[in-house]
């Protein structure tokens, strides 16, 4: 499991764990990491198993529960027992799953545009099988990534600085093992996330 462990010059005494979304890597947290270490926080930013620089097992349990257990094991191996979790998009759902599974180890939970809090079925979006999502992932191109990011992340605007993130994702989508690694980008979970929020013991932002 690839990760960054960045320690501040003037430590505040707390550790923030940053959990990336489906179309992101730990590297995309660079501005957040800089702000947090300037404020005195130690920062751990992993690439989830199946994503970016981490290993991509062909046969694996790509669930939020498993990814949470992996990340918790990483943090424990670094001697860290209590954390602040910051999760974006898919990483938001992962952060919530971690906080619910290991409640005594999370002091605060920050969810940034997390998935799972909207009832898309009620909005008319049809359910899809995991294998259908996988086939959709396999059709990804540089052009489709750029168009998706421009429309979804940048509200239609675009600057050359954004291209680096498109190239990063394109290398992952089209790299070795692309025929099966798409499975890792379709993590699944059980239960109603909104109901789970009511049972979370930590402070949520």
Name each model feature, range by range.
Residues 139-199:
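Conserved alpha/beta-hydrolase catalytic His-Asp/Glu region
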Residues 2-53:
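Conserved HGGG/HGGXW glycine-rich cap/lid loop of the alpha/beta-hydrolase fold
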Residues 24, 50, 92, 116-117:
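Active-site micro-motifs of SAM-dependent methyltransferase domains
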Residues 96-101, 107-140:
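Flexible "cap/lid" loop of the alpha/beta hydrolase fold
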Residues 4-7, 38, 45-90, 94, ...:
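Active-site loop/oxyanion-hole signature of alpha/beta-hydrolase fold enzymes
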Residues 28-30, 54-60, 120-123:
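Conserved catalytic-core motifs of eukaryotic protein kinase domains, centered on the activation segment
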Residues 201-205:
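Catalytic His-Asp charge-relay segment
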Residues 28-31, 66-74, 93, 97, ...:
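Alpha-helical elements of Rossmann-like donor-binding domains used by nucleotide-donor carbohydrate transfer enzymes
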């Amino acid at each position: 499991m690839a990760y960054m462990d960045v320690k501040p010059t003037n430590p505040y005494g707390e550790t923030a764990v940053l959990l990336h979304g489906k179309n992101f890597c730990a590297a995309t947290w660079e501005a957040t990491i800089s702000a947090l270490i300037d404020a005195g926080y130690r920062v751990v930013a992993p690439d989830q198993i199946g994503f970016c620089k981490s290993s991509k097992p062909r046969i694996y349990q790509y669930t939020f529960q498993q990814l949470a257990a992996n990340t918790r094991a990483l943090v424990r191996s670094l001697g860290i027992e209590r954390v602040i979790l910051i999760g974006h998009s898919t990483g938001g759902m992962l952060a919530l799953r971690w906080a619910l599974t290991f409640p005594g180890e999370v002091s605060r939970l920050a969810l940034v545009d997390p998935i799972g809090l909207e009832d898309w079925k009620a909005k008319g979006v049809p359910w899809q099988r995991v294998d259908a999502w996988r086939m959709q992932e396999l059709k990804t191109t540089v052009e489709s990534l750029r168009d998706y990011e421009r429309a979804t992340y940048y509200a239609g605007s675009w600057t050359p600085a954004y291209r680096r993130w498109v190239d990063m994702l394109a290398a992952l989508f089209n790299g070795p093992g692309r025929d099966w690694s798409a499975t890792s980008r379709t993590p699944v979970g059980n239960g109603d996330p909104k109901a789970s929020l009511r049972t979370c013991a930590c402070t949520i932002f």
